Amino acid sequence: MNTDPIADYLTRIRNANAANHRVVEIPASNVKKEITKILFDQGYILSYKFEDTTAQGTIKIALKYDKLTKEPVIKKIQRISKPGLRKYAGSTEIPRILNGLGIAVVSTSHGVMTGKQAKANKVGGEVLCYVY
């Protein structure tokens, strides 16, 4: 049994990027689906597809690579709040990642959103991960 499914999700993406895989398949959950939508909206992945072939379902993510250098678009994807040490931030405390070039993914009372959206909505929450 996995004690931190979000860390497993991020690690699968990180490992697939390191191995230059085009597609990665991940067990689905509601939070993972929301994070995937954010990654797509921010341009970090090419596409995604939710499949309900099993009881839990899966997420197929097509990873994005630079056309010239063939480097992954996601340089670093880092888990911040962990089950043993939760990290919360108010709307004014949400950090800017790489001076605005990266994103912070925040779980708020209004759902999972980017740090920029959380600041605009003036809501804080649990800082799940940084992506850049």
UniProtKB/Swiss-Prot annotation:
Pfam families the UniProt entry points to: Ribosomal_S8 (PF00410)
Coiled coil (UniProt feature): none
Domain of life: Bacteria
GO cellular component terms listed in the entry, alphabetical order: ribonucleoprotein complex; ribosome
Disulfide bridge map: none
SUPFAM superfamilies, A to Z: Ribosomal protein S8
Any GO molecular function: rRNA binding
InterPro entries in UniProt: Ribosomal_uS8, Ribosomal_uS8_CS, Ribosomal_uS8_sf
One record GO biological process: translation
Keywords: Ribonucleoprotein, Ribosomal protein, RNA-binding, rRNA-binding
Subunit structure: Part of the 30S ribosomal subunit. Contacts proteins S5 and S12.
Role noted for this protein: One of the primary rRNA binding proteins, it binds directly to 16S rRNA central domain where it helps coordinate assembly of the platform of the 30S subunit.
Record family assignment: Belongs to the universal ribosomal protein uS8 family.
Protein's recorded name: Small ribosomal subunit protein uS8
